Amino acid sequence: MDKSTLKQLIDQAAGRKPADTIIKNAKIVDVYNARIIEGTLAIADSRFLGIDAAYTADNVINAHGQYVVPGLIDPHIHIESANVSPAVFGSLVTPHGTTTILADPHEIVNVAGMRGLEYMVASAKNTALDIKYTMPSCVPAANPTLETSGAVITADEIKQSYDQGLTYGLAEFMNYPGVVNADDGVLDELLVSLNARKMIDGHSPALHGQGLNAYAAAGVHNDHECTQVDEMLDRISRGMYVYLRYGTVSKNMPTLLKGVTPQNARFCCLCGDDLQSVTLRETGHLDESIRVAIQNGIDPLTAIQMATINTAQCTGLSDRGGIAPGLKADFLLVDDLEHFNVNQTFIDGQKIAANGAYLLPTDDSVAGFDDLLETVHLDNFSADQLKLNLTSDKAHVIGLQSISRTQNLVLPVAHDAEGDFHYKPSEDIVKVAVVERHHLTGNVGVGLLSGFGLQNGAIATSIGHDSHNLVVVGTNDADMVVAIDALKACQGGGVAVQNGQVIATLPFVIGGLMSTEPIDSLIAHQKAFNTICHEQLNVTAQFDPIMKLGAMPLDVIPNLRITDKGLVDVTKFEIIDINA
């Protein structure tokens, strides 16, 4: 801002010159005092001027008694989980009142490194949504000896992203054992961020006591992995903010709300983390989180604070989060606070969404990034690579325990004379494998999975958090091979197979993570794919097949996971033998 612009802003705020826009007959949400102010709100040059009945302007908006709410801010979300580009993502969330997100692109960066980040930054320029990226801190998610990622990010790349203005802070530090143990490479990443005065996001499921003290002392600022109230309170008492997650699958917020009090609410923020397109289109984003918070007994103004001013203060976005003179004019209009149905969304004082629709053109181009359309690299795949060597009558089996965590089950399993697994429909145990797809290593980790419900067929996906190797589950090796081959042919996404035939395909050609389909077509195809998996392959009804399979390699969330290197005991961060 230059001197003349500042003078103009001051003159307009003082009423010496007319505003650009006024909103009259408005009920303005004052998030600072948790109250409602009835009056006229003035805006000029993308900034709020103030609230005063004497303001005038050529452009007058009559709110007709609607509430004016600050724009909603999501402090932690993965755009790739919606399987769309950043540009399309903006068109999905802005009609729900979201005006700013802090996005962690660690899915595409795990696949394509800095090239993936550059694509995300380029696509973000094609939406009105303000997207600020945090630099993925753990690529791969944990120790490289546990899995093979498409790229490796070190302190050098993190510094490069800061120096080039590509990122706003350091994304969730999933390698929390590395922080607690003061690993050398981890210290380098932390220091380059601390010295640059960048925010460091957390990820520390079940961490407590002195380990949590060490994590917070290292400069980690927040955590979104709390599942119980005691975890939340532990973090708040250490000066950390807690992000209450309400995603498509992981919905920890209702449980955590039981621990929110007038005394600690200012340290609580709402976040989505992982949200599918169909959820965003049909249910909502932070607007839905606010509704659910209110339904769970949170005062509407407190719920709004948790999606606006709390988040702005937590993330250092001092130019937004409230309706006050000089702040960025991001706001929305709603009829009433309890139901919180967003009628219109404004960013920088301009209306960009109304009545559930995005009002601007959506440019979903991948021009200049054609290399990201071919990221599934795989030699000829055969059933021999899926063989197990079971030497015991009992095996370590991944048990689908909760929304995000798994069990390390020790179960009796049948096997043939050569030691390979023998599937029995009555036992709901199937084979699961992770196939390396980045560097032609030939790595295949094979294990067993319980609770998925699959019968007579196979499902494969290129979404395998966080290194995004291929994940395949099946009742027989032949269908699993067909699924892997089909996934290679479409360059990623999801594939369902039965009796040797592909019965459903869902292509995600951008990095094997995001679709280039029009959004309505994509959502229809996702619904159809899920229906086939549930009705023809008998996948457990409450599971989204791809999201559930995609979490199986996530070797930073307890307890038992599988990667291209084998079974990972997350409590020990080591590869274990399948035989028990």
Curated annotation (Swiss-Prot):
<comment type="similarity">
    <text>Belongs to the metallo-dependent hydrolases superfamily. Adenine deaminase family.</text>
</comment>
<dbReference type="InterPro" id="IPR011059">
    <property type="entry name" value="Metal-dep_hydrolase_composite"/>
</dbReference>
<dbReference type="InterPro" id="IPR006680">
    <property type="entry name" value="Amidohydro-rel"/>
</dbReference>
<keyword id="KW-0378">Hydrolase</keyword>
<dbReference type="InterPro" id="IPR032466">
    <property type="entry name" value="Metal_Hydrolase"/>
</dbReference>
<dbReference type="Pfam" id="PF13382">
    <property type="entry name" value="Adenine_deam_C"/>
</dbReference>
<keyword id="KW-0464">Manganese</keyword>
<protein>
    <recommendedName>
        <fullName>Adenine deaminase 2</fullName>
        <ecNumber>3.5.4.2</ecNumber>
    </recommendedName>
</protein>
<dbReference type="InterPro" id="IPR026912">
    <property type="entry name" value="Adenine_deam_C"/>
</dbReference>
<dbReference type="GO" id="GO:0000034">
    <property type="term" value="F:adenine deaminase activity"/>
</dbReference>
<dbReference type="Pfam" id="PF01979">
    <property type="entry name" value="Amidohydro_1"/>
</dbReference>
<dbReference type="GO" id="GO:0006146">
    <property type="term" value="P:adenine catabolic process"/>
</dbReference>
<dbReference type="InterPro" id="IPR006679">
    <property type="entry name" value="Adenine_deam"/>
</dbReference>
